[in-house]
């Protein structure tokens, strides 16, 4: 929430590279949840602006709510699809889940995606009573670029240039906690932190030549310009630029074998939040790549846990599971809420 001067983002024509994923042939909805599909939190192009809400089928509200946008390197406007396993895990633990989509980098450049996400939060808060939700327990979560969205929601509260005027206005877009799976946090350092050989794999997989510094790589496409030639824009789109003591408690998870977003991006985020005095836990999981499914796998994984400003602190080596995640959210947002 520290205020920085936001440069004007100038769109640079970048040829289409990353095809958007088509709709799933058969979407499996979360068990144990009542679904409200196709809600519109703002009028946006394509599938952007869509929100699917899943409320626990057991118990009584108002339920705490987690907003989740599925990662895609900002190349898809279908962030409301793919988070169904997350919604199922959280719904059985007493949390409502809103899966929502923002504009892709082809539809609009930064800060449009943050404007969209804040509009989604305002929509949820404005309709909390109608949907049986607790407006004072709103959490942002996501993976990869979706984790970036969640983190930006956490660290940019009070930034007028990032609030936008989409959808419902006059309602707070503040979130009370963040869960971040392997998000990019400092665009200018990503390439230098890649694992040995990872840039070769990245270049081959995504059709680029200069790893994350390429004009057609995810980050440059997001800001509509080269991150190297326009470092001011790259910094403005990096969560690290906004961190201060008022940011919400944050749980971070990253695998050490991630060849898409290096785990040092999460190390930087943890260090910055720690320095600002923000309650934070960081789970660094050995031999795990760009994938959050380990949290539901039941496997025992070598996990290094760092924490700051948490009482009690998580124990060393604690396995990150959905029980651990919801216990963190319970502690940081006002106590347990479980189906009865």
Task: Please give the residue ranges for each predicted region.
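Short beta-strand element of the alpha/beta-hydrolase
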Residues: 62-71
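Short amphipathic alpha-helix adjacent to the substrate-entry channel of hydrolases
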Residues: 80-98
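Alpha/beta-hydrolase active-site loop
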Residues: 108-129, 323
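N-terminal cap/lid segment of alpha/beta-hydrolase-fold proteins
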Residues: 22-61
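Primarily recognizes the serine-hydrolase "nucleophile elbow" in alpha/beta-hydrolase
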Residues: 119-200
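C-terminal catalytic histidine-bearing segment of alpha/beta-hydrolase fold enzymes
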Residues: 251-253, 263-340
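Mobile cap/lid helix-loop segments that gate and shape the active-site cleft of serine hydrolases
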Residues: 25-34, 44, 154, 192-242, ...
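Short beta-strand/loop motif that positions the catalytic acidic residue
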Residues: 246, 252-254, 258
């Amino acid at each position: 929430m520290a205020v920085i001067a936001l440069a004007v983002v100038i769109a640079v024509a970048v040829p289409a590279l990353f095809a958007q994923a088509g709709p799933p042939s058969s979407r499996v909805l979360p068990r144990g949840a009542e679904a409200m599909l196709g809600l519109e939190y703002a009028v946006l192009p394509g599938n952007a602006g869509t929100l699917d809400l899943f409320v626990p089928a057991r118990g009584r509200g108002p339920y705490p709510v987690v907003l989740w946008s599925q990662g895609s390197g900002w190349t898809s406007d279908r962030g409301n699809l793919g988070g169904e396993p997350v919604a199922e895990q959280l719904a059985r633990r007493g949390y409502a889940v809103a899966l929502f989509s923002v504009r892709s980098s082809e539809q609009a450049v930064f800060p449009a995606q943050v404007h969209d996400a804040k509009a989604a939060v305002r929509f949820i808060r404005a309709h909390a009573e109608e949907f049986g939700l607790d407006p004072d327990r709103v959490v942002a979560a996501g993976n990869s670029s979706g984790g970036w969205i969640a983190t930006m929601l956490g660290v940019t509260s009070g930034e007028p240039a990032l609030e936008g005027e989409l959808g419902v206005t006059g309602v707070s877009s503040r979130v009370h906690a963040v869960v971040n799976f392997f998000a990019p946090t400092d665009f200018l350092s990503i390439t230098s932190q890649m694992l040995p050989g990872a840039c070769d794999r990245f270049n081959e997989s995504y059709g680029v030549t200069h790893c994350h510094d390429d004009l057609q790589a995810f980050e440059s496409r997001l800001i509509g310009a080269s991150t190297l030639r326009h470092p001011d824009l790259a910094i403005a789109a990096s969560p690290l630029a906004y961190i201060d003591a008022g940011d919400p408690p944050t749980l971070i998870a990253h695998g050490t074998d991630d060849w898409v977003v290096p785990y040092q991006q999460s190390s930087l985020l943890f260090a910055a939040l720690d320095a600002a005095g923000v309650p934070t836990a960081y789970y660094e999981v050995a031999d795990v790549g760009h994938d959050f499914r380990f949290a539901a796998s039941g496997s025992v994984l070598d996990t290094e846990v760092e924490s700051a400003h948490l009482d009690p602190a998580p124990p060393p080596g604690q396995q990150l599971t959905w029980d651990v995640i919801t216990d963190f959210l319970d502690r940081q947002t006002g106590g347990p809420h479980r189906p009865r």
